[in-house]
């Protein structure tokens, strides 16, 4: 499989869920520079990327402009991207499990006409997207590592399961890595690894994510290799790429070797 880069796709159980509609009075703003969603009154700057409020659009205006578009990865995984591209953009992934459909991470744009899912499993707090609105629309259960759920940027978003450690659910295996963010978690479902943005791009120029705590990111990276070293997988789904597993694993090994000798 060749590398595909896209161009233009606290427990909070007291929150109401499953209303199937979003109030017209709901205040939520989307940063068109990075795609971050801000709940409540419009702030002066984006707390994620620092863009000024002239780069924000209201959530319902964003719904009209940005269409979350599916791109098939295989028979059971679909990549979701906004068209046109919404800022930096990140991909979310829909998985058709035997126990129902779920997402890995969440689109930044809210589109109420998407096919419903039952749960959202997050790699980390950077890609919460419009998860609060999808949760309200479909009663989708939100899963985010407890260490990330308590970070200020994540606190406005309801989390149904602030998990800890590794777990398996619906056939999806979750592995707590840490590093790039305290709660960073990667997922494996059948033949697919969901690595998000821990290391990118695929190929000889791969690097560890340069944003966030560099030492922790480097120190925790071997945990990824431990998990995948004996796995017979086929595909790697990242925050802006889809690629073949064996070559990605070799590139990741070389990256860690370079990091050791640096």
Predicted regions and their residues:
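A broadly conserved sequence feature marking short terminus-proximal activation segments
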Residues: 1-27
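Metallo-beta-lactamase
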Residues: 19-44, 52-55, 101-102, 150, ...
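Short Cys/His-rich micro-motifs in 6-15 aa windows
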Residues: 49-61
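Conserved beta-strand hairpin/beta-sheet module of binuclear metal-dependent hydrolase folds
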Residues: 64-110, 185-201
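Active-site HxH/HxHxD metal-binding segment of metal-dependent hydrolases
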Residues: 85, 107-169, 256-258
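Short amphipathic alpha-helical segments and helix-helix/interface helices
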Residues: 92, 110-112, 131-135, 221-228
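A general structural motif
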Residues: 99, 116-117, 139, 232-234
